[in-house]
Amino acid sequence: MYEYEEVRIKMDLIQKNLLEQVAGLHEIPEGAYNIRANGTKLGRNTTANIDIVTKTDKDGIDIIIKPGTVNESVHIPVLLSESGMQECVYNDFYIGEGADVTIVAGCGIHNCGVDTSKHDGVHTFYLEKNAKVRYIERHYGEGDGNGENIMNPQTIVHLKEGAHMEMETTQIKGIDSTVRVTKGDLAENASLEIHETVSYTHLRAHETCADL
């Protein structure tokens, strides 16, 4: 039995703008999603083929996609609108054999204070045989310039035989410092394709590391 939250998710104008920037959404999407805002779950929806479960041992969620799932997507944006909010979140993705799905992630920070706001996201992917994932991740920051916006994304991929993952990562603007780490192991005939776009507006430090 899947979970469906038929609710009016309450977001202020700042959060709505962040959601549009990082997920391209003007409203709550159809299908599976998990929206996190200032350290708490703002809204969640699952489908018959995509389940989302809150972790019990640390901060984060498990996204479980059934074998053979095609033409479905899941959105998991993170919004920080309180100055000084800092978090480390662990999201694990389990993609069943033969599935072909799109995953849209990303984080938006609004910081109009003097404190540092930071989001460290650790995303681990487990792709079964012949599974395919298009993974889109966007980072965006804004504020009055007095407090720093920091994001440190880490992506770990485990691809079984014939699996394919395409990563599209975009740092839009407004991030002061970021370290991106990508690690993975690929079985026979598996492939990983990475596209990274970085805007250097306000960026003071950027580093990308890959270990494949």
Stretches found by the model and what they are:
Residues 148-204:
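Loop-centered beta-sheet repeat module
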Residues 202-212:
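Single conserved hydrophobic/aromatic residue that forms the stacking wall/gate
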Residues 100-101, 110, 131-133, 163-165, ...:
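Extracellular beta-strand scaffolds
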Residues 117-129, 150-154:
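Surface-exposed loop/turn motifs in large extracellular/passenger domains
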Residues 1-100, 104-114:
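N-terminal leader/transition segments
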Residues 110-114, 142-147:
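Acidic/polar low-complexity surface segments
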